[in-house]
């Protein structure tokens, strides 16, 4: 496995692989890798000959009071995990390589509708930053396939739309959420949780499952179900950001006729923001 830091190096190596007829898969990450990330790498390896994992803590997708400065940078440990998972190439650029003229002068990609609401409402500018850097990575790597986790459900929808709308020839693949034994979705930010908070955190997934069970039993009073879920989170000691029942394709509020539903949740536990989701077919 090789690690490169410049776009020039990246393109030179990938040109050689393409001349050999190899297919290329991309797994974009911000590093601080866990088993969820590694599952994406394995999925990419199943679907392509060469796997490129990018490690870049993207400043454009962080808000003013978020954890850009404290987000863990663990490149050496990440490299060890990736090598063991069958990754081929690590692209770990610095900020200057991606944004040579600075963020203020950077062309930005805005994905309408699907990026609005939910995390888009709570984190203004976040999906603009995600869409911009992912579009750049698609252009830099020119992958045949790219793998993203379903844990970030709205992000996956944003990326699928941008690839479709901008006619980028890449197959965007979603990979199932990897969970701890108690149901907590694996996340780089779980490391911020105290021992006490870690014991409380599984209530997020339990609340999703309980609400999904209610829907499976035929309930369609979505606003009441959403409030019940927020109340359950609050009673457990979390501060709900949102709990929304949406159409799985549009991410708009679900109607009684919708058959494909997704439950989206974000909640603070202490200072840590946890997100999760669960999709069902009725």
UniProtKB/Swiss-Prot annotation:
Q: Does the keyword Nucleotidyltransferase apply?
A: no
Q: Which UniProt keywords apply?
A: ATP-binding, Cytoplasm, Ligase, Nucleotide-binding, Pantothenate biosynthesis
Query: Where is this gene product found?
Result: Cytoplasm
Entry keyword annotation includes Cytoplasm: yes
Catalytic site positions:
37 (proton donor)
Its UniProt entry gives the catalysed reaction(s) as:
(R)-pantoate + beta-alanine + ATP = (R)-pantothenate + AMP + diphosphate + H(+)
Provide the top EC class.
ligase
Main subcellular localisation: cytoplasm
Q: Which GO terms describe its cellular component?
A: cytosol
For ATP, which residues are the binding ones?
30-37, 149-152, 178, 186-189
- Residues given in the record as (R)-pantoate binding sites: 61, 155
Tell me which Gene Ontology terms the entry assigns under biological process: pantothenate biosynthetic process
Protein residues bound to beta-alanine: 61
Q: In which pathway does it act?
A: Cofactor biosynthesis; (R)-pantothenate biosynthesis; (R)-pantothenate from (R)-pantoate and beta-alanine: step 1/1
Gene3D superfamilies on file = HUPs (3.40.50.620), Pantoate-beta-alanine ligase, C-terminal domain (3.30.1300.10)
Q: Which domain of life is it from?
A: Bacteria
The Enzyme Commission number assigned here is: 6.3.2.1
Gene Ontology molecular functions: ATP binding; pantoate-beta-alanine ligase activity
Q: Which InterPro entries match?
A: Pantoate_ligase (IPR003721), Pantoate_ligase_C (IPR042176), Rossmann-like_a/b/a_fold (IPR014729)
Q: What does the record give as the function of this protein?
A: Catalyzes the condensation of pantoate with beta-alanine in an ATP-dependent reaction via a pantoyl-adenylate intermediate.
Q: What else is known?
A: The reaction proceeds by a bi uni uni bi ping pong mechanism.
Q: Which family does it belong to?
A: Belongs to the pantothenate synthetase family.
Known partners and oligomeric status = Homodimer.
Q: What is this protein called?
A: Pantothenate synthetase
Question: What is the organism of origin for this protein?
Answer: Marinobacter nauticus (strain ATCC 700491 / DSM 11845 / VT8) (Marinobacter aquaeolei)
